[in-house]
């Protein structure tokens, strides 16, 4: 296990941060792809339609071509959707990390190992929190695939929690996709509670891709720890 340390983002990290974020998002495409294939209405199209083609026309070739094109188009849809989301992020908050986070009462941290950035996480204040709450939102958690299993993701989340405590926040909140199984397991294992879920569009509802909302409530300075 290679040693690592966590520090605040510096401008020289920018290219590596973008690459790490992009690769991390692309890793979710296969999970979403296989998830959709298991849905009941997907089974009508694959393998339902190929079987029907064989029964009606007797053509295995036509059924094979349909199956290939169906899988190719489905994979392409998810890939393009992912790339569009990444491009949107790269043109938004990740275009100028210092301005988006460090100069906006938040922060952006990187985990460094062997002189390379291998993990990232960010945090920003929630603009309109519930009445009586002061909330910090966790963003952009990602760890290089070659450096997972070393506790880096957990350490990055702890950095955000400590930052929130130091700044007097009452909660740390975050959103994540329901296909991000490892992230969900990490958050729940660290004490985050699922407080809601929603669909960003009708299309996402139809294919069962939802967004989970998690909250970690921080004890007040006067509240005794159990």
Curated annotation (Swiss-Prot):
InterPro entries: Acyl_CoA_acyltransferase (IPR016181), GNAT_dom (IPR000182), NAT_camello-type (IPR050769)
Class of this enzyme: transferase
Transmembrane annotation, as ranges: 33-55, 60-82
Presence of the UniProt keyword Endoplasmic reticulum in the record: no
Documented EC number(s): 2.3.1.-
Domain (N-acetyltransferase): residue spans on this chain: 69-221
Residues with PTM N6-acetyllysine: 204
GO molecular function: N-acetyltransferase activity
GO cellular component assignments: membrane
Disulphide-bridged cysteine pairs: none
Pfam family, one: Acetyltransf_1
This protein's UniProt keywords: Acetylation, Acyltransferase, Developmental protein, Gastrulation, Membrane, Transferase, Transmembrane, Transmembrane helix
Name of the protein this chain belongs to: N-acetyltransferase family 8 member 2
Gene symbol of the encoding locus: Nat8f2
